[in-house]
Amino acid sequence: MFLEIKGIKKSFGAGESHVDVLKGIDLEIEKGEFCVLLGPSGSGKSTLLNIIGGIDGADSGSITIQGEQLEDMKEKKLSLYRRKHLGYIFQMYNLIPNLTVRENIEVGAYLSDRPLDVDELLETLGLYEHQRKLPNQLSGGQQQRTAIGRAIVKNPDILLCDEPTGALDYNTSKEILKLIETVNHNYGNTIVMVTHNDAIKDMADRVVKLRDGMIRRNYQNEQKIPAADLEW
């Protein structure tokens, strides 16, 4: 199994402010699978994503990726693993303001010993003609495309997406979802996406519904819908 999650528990606070955010999560994700974590605010989906990405630690349980247990890694090895094998896309773009589109993407390439071709990626992203622009010269959709480029140029094994369309309008959101779909198809990255948008589940290979820190439903999507055909 490519990604195996066993018995993950996580809580925050103490005393009266103690909250159990994750209450024993078990989940398996295949290599190349597009998995959507769906649920309302406070369901634990973003916390789970952060634990998968090594950004946060679990109170108990284990995360195994390609046979390696994250909790067994020392901080230096974990940091190196994140840099080489994981890509992150967030709702906020977090681009470096004084670097061009191309330079922002190249930042990701420098972190990898097996980067994708930047020119080819710029074409895929629809950014080739904008590669010399600074972030403040771009639309929101173009900024998110640049952020996606920076994440995937590393050629990561896993792409972690936390509400990547949350700050975008309907049409731009669909363009970004089509791009993520293309990335999954062309490069074979395993994708784990957090969203509260129920419609996005229809383009996923696997749908995991969370509520109150527990998985309420986990199923494979037998009839996927292309991102271009999604409606909400």
Regions found by a protein language model. Give the residues of each.
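ABC family nucleotide-binding domain
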Residues: 2-204, 209
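Conserved beta-strand-loop-alpha-helix hinge in the C-terminal portion
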Residues: 214-232
